[in-house]
A protein has these predicted regions:
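Outer-membrane beta-barrel domain signature
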Residues: 47-48, 102-108, 136-140, 177-180, ...
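Signature for the C-terminal beta-barrel architecture of outer-membrane proteins
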Residues: 168, 188-320
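Transmembrane beta-strands of outer-membrane beta-barrel pores
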Residues: 95-101, 123-125, 132-138, 155-157, ...
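Transmembrane beta-strand segments of Gram-negative outer membrane beta-barrel proteins
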Residues: 25-37, 74-132, 160, 209-213
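Surface-exposed loop and membrane-interface regions of Gram-negative outer-membrane beta-barrel proteins
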Residues: 109, 128-153, 171-180
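Bacterial N-terminal signal peptides
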Residues: 7-16
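Short loop/turn motifs that connect adjacent beta-strands in outer-membrane beta-barrel proteins
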Residues: 47-49, 80-90, 122-126, 154-157, ...
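Residues that define the transmembrane beta-barrel architecture of outer-membrane proteins
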Residues: 107-115, 142-147, 183-192, 226-230, ...
């Protein structure tokens, strides 16, 4: 609740002079596919494996042809798919007999029956979205949450924000190794690239590079209450149609565990030496063993290749 109050406070402060940059969630995956087909037709590509995406990234994909007819038509295509609305209200009602055990990329986390109201605003530099949902939990009681509410600011080709975002990191449509919508999003801060970075010289071969980083606070009803969840992902597009992604997440800190820079450094670099996620001599992980088990983390790599066949988009991918 304290995160929600803080979010409302920020929105009230900036409502009168907001300019915004939109975040595109995994529920808009069908729209993104339309953009991907158009890009493949024009021999271009952009990162579509790290949701939420940014509209700035889509708009700037052909920015090196800013006065080219192809780029003008592409911008019109993006604007036609994602309506240029500065303010939007949305009400959704979902009715299910059971909680969905399997979800696709465009499914939101909900209980058996849910009702949600959403208001969003976007402009040039600052955007916000407020969403409140009521749903039936597993014991058939009505509960409320503010998932998918956030506020974000754009500058220096970066997006900074705070909120609870649905993330889908990976090339698939119905499952991922690490981050998907199978669990509710947790509140936290995040930063990600807006339209990607390109390097000259020796690093030019890696192509356009995008990154996303977040630090979230998890819930209290777990073995170690209220740990931090840190997630990072980098993607590279060395040439058109090929996307390579690297993902890493770690849980660190929590009740009765250290939360400082030393532990973070030990967790980040110690994993490379096999000093993380270890089991003690008694074949059990000691929750208080900060020195030998500073965090719980996993990593993944994925590769996606797209091509057109008779105006149909075909994708091959692998993740490990």
């Amino acid at each position: 609740m304290k995160y929600f109050k803080f979010l409302i406070f920020i929105i009230l402060i900036f409502t009168n002079f907001i300019n915004a940059s939109a975040l595109i969630g995994p529920n808009d995956e069908i729209k993104i596919k339309k953009i991907e087909i158009y890009l493949n037709q024009n021999y271009a590509n952009t990162d579509t494996t790290t949701y939420p995406l940014t509209k700035g990234m889509l708009n700037n994909t052909l920015s090196n042809k800013s006065y080219d007819v192809d780029h003008i038509l592409y911008r019109q295509k993006v604007n036609s798919v994602f309506e240029n609305e500065t303010k939007r209200h949305e009400i959704k009602l979902n009715v299910f007999s059971e909680i969905l055990p399997v979800r696709n990329i465009d499914d939101a986390w909900n209980g058996k029956n849910s009702l949600s109201y959403q208001i969003s605003y976007q402009g040039n530099n600052l955007t916000y979205q407020f969403k409140i949902s009521s749903y039936e939990n597993r014991v058939n009681k009505t509960d409320y949450h503010f998932d998918e509410s956030y506020i974000a600011y754009t500058n220096w080709n970066l997006v900074f924000g705070f909120g609870s975002l649905n993330r889908w990191w990976g090339p698939t449509h119905n499952n991922n190794l690490i981050l998907s919508n199978f669990a509710r999003p947790s509140p936290g801060v995040f930063v990600q690239s807006l339209s990607g970075f390109e390097f000259d010289g020796l690093l030019s071969f890696i192509g356009k590079t995008n990154f996303s980083l977040f630090v979230n606070r998890l819930e209290s009803n777990r073995a170690v209450p209220n740990p931090y969840l840190i997630g990072s992902r980098m993607t590279f597009i060395p040439f058109n149609n090929l996307q390579i992604g690297f993902t890493r997440t770690m849980m660190i800190g929590g009740e009765n565990r250290k939360e400082n820079g030393d532990i973070l450094i030990k967790a980040f670099f110690g994993a490379l030496e096999g000093a993380d996620n270890i089991v003690g001599s008694n074949e059990r992980t000691d929750l208080n063993s900060f020195e030998h088990d500073p965090s719980n983390q996993i990593a993944a790599i994925d590769v996606k290749y797209d091509f057109l066949f008779k105006n149909n988009l075909i994708s091959f991918y692998v993740q490990k």
